[in-house]
């Protein structure tokens, strides 16, 4: 391993080419290949895994065949840039071994994104990431479609006999398990399985995954325990678990990419944020593994490399977990343990060797750097730092912004000493690319840079950092060139506020593996200083977040990263999320505000609707009035234009309305003495009608009292009907017109009239009563009449039935008996008649009502014949009905043809017209009522 790592000078050399090596396109191809290999090549599962691992570690397919030293040498070339190593470390930190594979790929990305150690190359490489992302995005889409198809096939025929389906099922199960691991749900089981199996899923870069898991357990346990986990498994064990995690990472990346596809930034973020998310998930897994299964890491304690890594890996913890667990060769781990002497050269070598074989090796240099920087830190401190790093790494995976959260978590998670070491890691994380501690100490900047670069790599793994830089760039948070390095520093600044991140630029320049290695021996001091300086700050701010961070980091790794990927707005949300909670809260708060806006708009709409409803109601009310006015005007016009005969004809032909209008003209005929009124009637008649009606009212009242006393049970039962009839009694002439309508509407018309014949009038009166009520003094009476008639309808119907046959008899008898009274009463009605006709015009309902009462006299007699027939007919009909009926009968003969009811109504109208008995008609109705 050392020999393999010593090629680091090539790493330094390859840093220049690191950008080329870390082509975003290779990353995209790697991801696509990984996804495709996992999803589509069930038969080539192992080969695909190896191929994926190779792509991750080497950024090429060179390491597919060679998982050993040659891939290691290649890997250094790919990952040689310190940024690559950092990223690999970040991958280890954020995600366990599987995430390290991603990290290796990301290391290339970092090199492309962040160039070598300087931000400018990163900027230049970002476009490459964007391009490769487009390709990768397409590949991811294709892989996703394939996986979906495969999943659908597998789901539909779970027990299918086809070999392909079986292979897919196996592959799917494996992937699901890995995915769960990446999510941190099944990491313990996978770790145990990997330990038990001990088979290298992919010789290259698989160890980091298992190592990450041990590191996660190491978090709860002593630093040594996490590293032993990988030793117990051995290189093969680490590779197996790492590969499984890599597969899970690939699955996770696929999912993330699918999620990220939603937003244009997704293309860029898929490579960056997707891998970061997967890494963060692996870190969450490792955390869960640590918490749930710290013993397996203890079991792995035997590996000295892991122990060594953990001692120096407080910064490594996130990444060191990968390095320690993933260090296939214990010597490398030992080198890590010896950060001052061996680590300085070895970190480069180990980073190269580790990156090439494990993909962790690359991160291992970062680990070594961390070890150098942190080797002075006590084992407890290192262990705590590992725990912190794990926590931190998960949040950074979620987002570079969350790196602060992770840093506080680490600081709060371990003791004060641990906080220092974790602070070192935290510093690395906040300054992921900046390596503020390294930068702070210029002599140690290079050395610390590797350690912090490792943490930075973790943030870099949370490529959201670089992505965030692009998006955050508008906010002025980070410059696109130094996005990775400065992003975490900026985030770190927000976290710590105190720390000056000016060094980050130098740290970027110092990231070259060799300088970093040399500095790595010094970095522990610098990092310690930074930790001593910043750890309190980290503790202060993140302490509130410390407890939630693991879950929060997991949540962030799964969701917040996706949100970042989804849109710059999410980044803006993340901008405040430099404090992990605030960013998350902001993301949530914004939707809440939007929801409130929607509710407000809905409320406004509701109020508008209510207003419209109010408008509608008033409209409904005036319509009846308008109808009444129109009816009255039409009646007046008809009265003027049409003669009595025409009036009679109309009711038969037209119906109730026509008869009503004709009745008004009949009233005019009655009022024929007042020709002026005919001219006046439309308006003046309206005014006069109330006067005239007022005169008849008292008469109807008397008649009503009589009718109630003498009349049928219906009238006696309800005096209100009698009152209505009294009001309507004025319109007896119009009632004559009612017969035809009564035929059509016998019930309503009949019942409306108190008198048996009044039903006709009632029908007319209700139709016109509104106008009469509106225009006439009757108005209250008419209004009462309207509702009451509806109630009285059945009763009036009865009188109408009774009145049908008796109408003729009572009409004749009453005509004779009433002849004497009619002249006298007629005189007064005639005197009033001039006005009355106008009133009829205005209040056709009243005259109508009046008319039917005259015929109604026979009706009450009819109804009363059944009930009180003899007395009622004799008393009431003789008074007024006889003349009305005699006159009505002659003209009403047509109405008679219609029916006895029709006969009744025409009688009053005719009697009033022919004999000028309008007064008689009025009198009979009044007398009858």
UniProtKB/Swiss-Prot annotation:
The keyword Membrane does not apply. Actin-associated protein that may play a role in modulating actin-based shape and motility of dendritic spines and renal podocyte foot processes. Seems to be essential for the formation of spine apparatuses in spines of telencephalic neurons, which is involved in synaptic plasticity. It comes from Mus musculus (Mouse). GO terms for molecular function: actin binding. It is found in: Cytoplasm, Cytoskeleton; Cell junction, Tight junction; Perikaryon; Cell projection, Dendritic spine. GO terms for biological process: cortical cytoskeleton organization; positive regulation of actin filament bundle assembly; postsynaptic modulation of chemical synaptic transmission; regulation of long-term neuronal synaptic plasticity; regulation of postsynaptic cytosolic calcium ion concentration; regulation of stress fiber assembly; spine apparatus assembly; visual learning. Residues 208-221, 317-329, 567-580, 812-839 have a biased composition (Low complexity). Residues 54-77, 111-243, 280-382, 395-416, 497-520, 539-595, 688-714, 805-912 are annotated as: Disordered. Residues 146-164, 282-293, 330-339, 346-361, 398-413, 872-893 have a biased composition (Polar residues). Expressed in brain, namely in the olfactory bulb, cerebral cortex, striatum, and hippocampus, but not in the cerebellum. Also expressed in the podocytes of kidney glomeruli. In the hippocampus, mainly expressed in the principal cell layer of the dentate gyrus and Ammon's horn. A motif (PPxY motif) lies at residues 549-552, 568-571. The modification Phosphoserine is found at residues 134, 202, 222, 258, 488, 512, 567, 672, 689, 740, 744, 765, 833, 854. This is Synaptopodin. Synpo deficient mice develop normally, but they lack the spine apparatuses. Adult mice have an impairment of spatial learning in the radial arm maze test. The gene is Synpo. Belongs to the synaptopodin family. The modification Omega-N-methylarginine is found at residue 848. One of its GO terms (cellular component) is perikaryon. O-glycosylated.
């Amino acid at each position: 391993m050392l020999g393999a790592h010593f090629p680091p000078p090539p790493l330094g050399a390859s840093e220049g080419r690191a950008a080329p090596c870390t082509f975003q396109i290779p990353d995209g191809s790697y991801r696509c290949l990984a996804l495709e290999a996992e999803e589509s090549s069930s038969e080539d599962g192992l080969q695909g895994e190896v191929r994926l691992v190779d792509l991750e570690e080497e950024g090429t397919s060179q390491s597919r065949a060679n998982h050993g030293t040659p891939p290691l040498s290649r890997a250094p070339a790919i990952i040689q840039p310190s940024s690559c190593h950092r990223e690999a470390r970040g991958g280890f930190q954020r995600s366990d071994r599987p995430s390290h594979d991603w990290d290796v790929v990301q290391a290339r990305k970092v090199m492309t994104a962040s160039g070598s150690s300087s931000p400018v190359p990163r900027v230049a490489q970002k476009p490459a990431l964007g391009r490769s992302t487009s390709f990768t995005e397409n590949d991811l889409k294709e892989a996703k479609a394939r996986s979906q198809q495969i999943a659908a096939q597998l789901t539909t025929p779970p027990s299918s006999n086809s070999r392909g389906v079986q292979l897919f099922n196996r592959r799917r199960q494996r992937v699901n398990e890995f995915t769960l691991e990446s999510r941190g749900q099944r990491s313990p089981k996978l770790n145990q399985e990997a330990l038990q199996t001990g088979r290298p899923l992919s010789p290259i870069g698989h160890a980091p995954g298992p190592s990450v898991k041990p590191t996660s357990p190491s978090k709860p346990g002593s630093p040594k325990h996490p590293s032993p986990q990988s030793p117990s498994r051995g290189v093969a064990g680490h590779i197996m678990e790492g590969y499984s995690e890599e597969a899970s990472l690939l699955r996770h990346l696929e999912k993330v990419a699918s999620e990220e596809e939603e937003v244009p930034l997704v293309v860029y973020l898929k490579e960056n944020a997707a891998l970061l998310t997967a890494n963060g998930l692996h870190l969450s897994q490792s955390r869960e593994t640590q918490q749930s299964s710290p013993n397996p890491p203890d079991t792995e304690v035997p590996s000295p490399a892991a122990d060594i890594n953990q001692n120096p890996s407080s910064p490594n913890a996130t990444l060191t977990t990968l390095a320690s667990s993933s260090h296939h060769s214990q010597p490398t781990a030992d080198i890590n343990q010896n950060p001052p002497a061996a680590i300085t050269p070895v970190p480069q070598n180990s980073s190269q060797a580790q990156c090439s074989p494990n993909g962790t090796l690359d991160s291992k240099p970062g680990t070594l750097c961390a070890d150098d920087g942190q080797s002075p830190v006590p084992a407890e401190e290192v262990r705590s730092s590992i725990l912190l790093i794990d926590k931190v790494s998960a949040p950074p995976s979620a987002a570079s912004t969350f790196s602060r959260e992770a840093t506080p978590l680490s600081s709060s998670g371990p003791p004060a000493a641990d906080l220092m070491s974790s602070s070192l890691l935290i510093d690395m994380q906040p300054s992921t690319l900046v390596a503020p501690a390294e930068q702070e100490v210029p002599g140690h900047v290079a050395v610390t840079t590797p350690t912090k670069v490792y943490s930075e790599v973790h943030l870099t793994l949370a490529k959201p950092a670089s992505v965030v830089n692009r998006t955050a760039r508008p906010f002025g948070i980070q410059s696109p060139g130094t996005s990775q390095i400065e992003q975490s520093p900026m985030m770190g600044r927000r976290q710590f506020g105190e720390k000056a991140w000016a060094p980050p630029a130098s740290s970027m320049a110092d990231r070259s593996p060799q300088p970093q290695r040399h500095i790595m021996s010094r970095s522990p001091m610098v990092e310690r200083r930074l930790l001593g300086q910043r750890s309190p700050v980290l503790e202060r701010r993140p302490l509130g977040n410390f407890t939630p961070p693991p879950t929060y980091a997991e949540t962030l790794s799964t969701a917040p990263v996706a949100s970042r990927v989804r849109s710059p707005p999410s980044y803006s949300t993340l901008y405040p999320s430099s404090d992990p909670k605030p960013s998350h809260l902001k993301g949530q708060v914004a939707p809440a505000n939007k929801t409130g806006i929607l509710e407000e708009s809905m409320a406004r709409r509701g109020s508008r609707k209510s207003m419209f409803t109010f408008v509608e109601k008033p409209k409904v009310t005036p319509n009846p009035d308008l109808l009444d006015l129109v009816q009255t005007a039409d009646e007046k016009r008809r009265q003027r234009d049409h003669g009595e005969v025409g009036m009679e004809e109309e009711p038969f032909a037209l119906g109730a309305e026509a008869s009503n209008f004709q009745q008004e003209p009949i009233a005019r005929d009655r009022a024929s003495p007042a020709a002026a009124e005919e001219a006046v009637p439309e308006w003046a008649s309206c005014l006069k009608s109330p006067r005239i009606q007022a005169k008849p009212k008292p008469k109807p009242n008397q008649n009503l009292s009589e009718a109630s006393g003498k009349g049928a049970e219906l009238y006696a039962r309800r005096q209100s009907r009698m009152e209505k009839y009294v009001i309507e009694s004025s319109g007896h002439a119009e009632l004559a017109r009612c017969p035809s309508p009564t035929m059509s509407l016998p019930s309503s018309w009949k019942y409306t009239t108190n008198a048996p014949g009044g039903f006709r009038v009632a029908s007319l009166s209700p139709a016109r009563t509104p106008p009469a009520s509106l225009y006439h003094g009757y108005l209250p009476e008419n209004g009462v009449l309207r509702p009451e008639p509806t109630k009285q309808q059945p009763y009036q119907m009865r009188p109408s039935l009774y009145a049908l046959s008796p109408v003729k008899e009572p009409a004749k008898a009453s005509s004779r008996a009433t002849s004497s009274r009619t002249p006298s009463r007629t005189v007064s009605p005639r005197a009033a008649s001039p006005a009355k006709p106008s009133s009829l015009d205005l209040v056709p309902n009243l005259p109508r009502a009046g008319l039917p009462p005259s015929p109604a006299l026979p009706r009450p007699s009819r109804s009363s014949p059944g009930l009180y027939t003899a007395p009622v007919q004799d008393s009431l009909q003789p008074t007024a009905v006889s003349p009305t009926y005699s006159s009505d009968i002659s003209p009403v003969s047509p109405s008679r043809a219609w029916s006895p009811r029709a006969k009744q109504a025409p009688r009053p109208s005719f009697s009033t017209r022919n004999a000028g008995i309008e007064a008689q008609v009025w009198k009979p109705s009044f007398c009858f009522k």
